[in-house]
Amino acid sequence: MSSITLFGAGSWGTAMSVHLASAGRDVVLWARRPEVADEIRRTSHNPTYLPELLIPSSVYITTDLEKAAEASDLWGMAVPSQQLRGRAEHLRPHAHSGVRLVALSKGIENETLLTMSQVLDDVFESVPSDQIGALYGPSHAEEVAEGRPTAVVAAAPDEGEARHIQKVFMTERLRVYMNTDVLGVEIGGSAKNVLAIAAGIADGVSYGDNAKAALVTRGLAEIRRLGQALGADPQTFAGLAGIGDLVVTCMSPHSRNRYLGEQISTGKSLDEVLNDMAMVAEGVRTTRSVYNLAKHHGVEMPITEAVHAILFDDKSPRKMVKRLMTRSAKHENWLPTTLQQ
């Protein structure tokens, strides 16, 4: 029987604990807040995230970081992206060369512009780089928790490590594919949250299906451009962590980032919307990171630039859409000269 420790009792950590426990895995779920851990122990429900979900008694809940770390050599990191480094630094003394790390949260660190697996690699010097991977794809926590059919991708630099992640997480309800392009998987799975905000804005101002289709298609093109500039395999963006994750995040009522964009379109300020949301919308901070990555590498990402201007420069959504629609004419498969070489 495989064992795993999940760090983070948010919606994804909670959903994954139920999924893995249902598959017969030994699961330890680490919660930062004692009151959350106490409530889960008492009621078998997380009071804040997915409160309707019944958490099996076989899931061991703890707030003791050392105890959680020592319970398994496979650690699933489900804390919010901008908190990952801090949590990892607290865990570092308990890591060793036999530990495997799986990034479950999606995002790009604001200060360093590193992906989640890169942050883990930066912090955990005692863990070999090829033992650090990610599990990404079109997978809303609500549906995974309910056991609805879902497909994701396990990415690790070494195929054997990717296969190990696949073996632990895969069940008849969660199909897991493998990929060794960790960078491409993480860029696709993170940058799509920026496009989801744009999709929500489009929904909020009732631009219709044509606009949404254009947004998803051209959004994928700019994510792929960024990925190629960073050295990712362009084929990855045609997979689950690329177009798959982009479609579900832009279309689903479960998407926090799409919802945030919809609320922004009503004239609310970003602070107002965030204060009203109980759960983290990773796309806000990821917008800063993707915008800065694109600038640093000279990659044109007009939709990302528009979302950045709306969120942080108080630009009108309608005016930014007009700017996008009146850009100079281009070939559909246009690429910067640097990416054609």
Curated annotation (Swiss-Prot):
Q: Which Gene3D superfamilies does the protein's record reference?
A: N-(1-d-carboxylethyl)-l-norvaline Dehydrogenase, domain 2, NAD(P)-binding Rossmann-like Domain
Q: Which InterPro entries match?
A: 6-PGluconate_DH-like_C_sf (IPR008927), 6PGD_dom2 (IPR013328), G3P_DH_NAD-dep (IPR006168), G3P_DH_NAD-dep_C (IPR006109), G3P_DH_NAD-dep_N (IPR011128), NAD(P)-bd_dom_sf (IPR036291)
Instruction: Write out the GO MF terms.
Output: glycerol-3-phosphate dehydrogenase [NAD(P)+] activity; NAD binding
One Gene Ontology cellular component: cytosol
Q: Which residues act catalytically here?
A: 192
What top-level class of enzyme does the UniProt entry assign?
oxidoreductase
In this chain, sn-glycerol 3-phosphate is annotated as bound at: 106, 137, 139, 192, 245, 255-257
What subcellular locations does the record give? Cytoplasm
Instruction: Report whether Oxidoreductase shows up as a keyword of the record.
Output: yes
Which pathway, per its entry? Answer: Membrane lipid metabolism; glycerophospholipid metabolism
Q: Which SUPFAM superfamilies match?
A: 6-phosphogluconate dehydrogenase C-terminal domain-like, NAD(P)-binding Rossmann-fold domains
Q: Can you state which reaction this protein catalyses?
A: sn-glycerol 3-phosphate + NAD(+) = dihydroxyacetone phosphate + NADH + H(+); sn-glycerol 3-phosphate + NADP(+) = dihydroxyacetone phosphate + NADPH + H(+)
One matching Pfam family: NAD_Gly3P_dh_C
Please describe what this protein does: Catalyzes the reduction of the glycolytic intermediate dihydroxyacetone phosphate (DHAP) to sn-glycerol 3-phosphate (G3P), the key precursor for phospholipid synthesis.
Official protein name in the record: Glycerol-3-phosphate dehydrogenase [NAD(P)+] 1
Q: Which species is listed as the source?
A: Salinibacter ruber (strain DSM 13855 / M31)
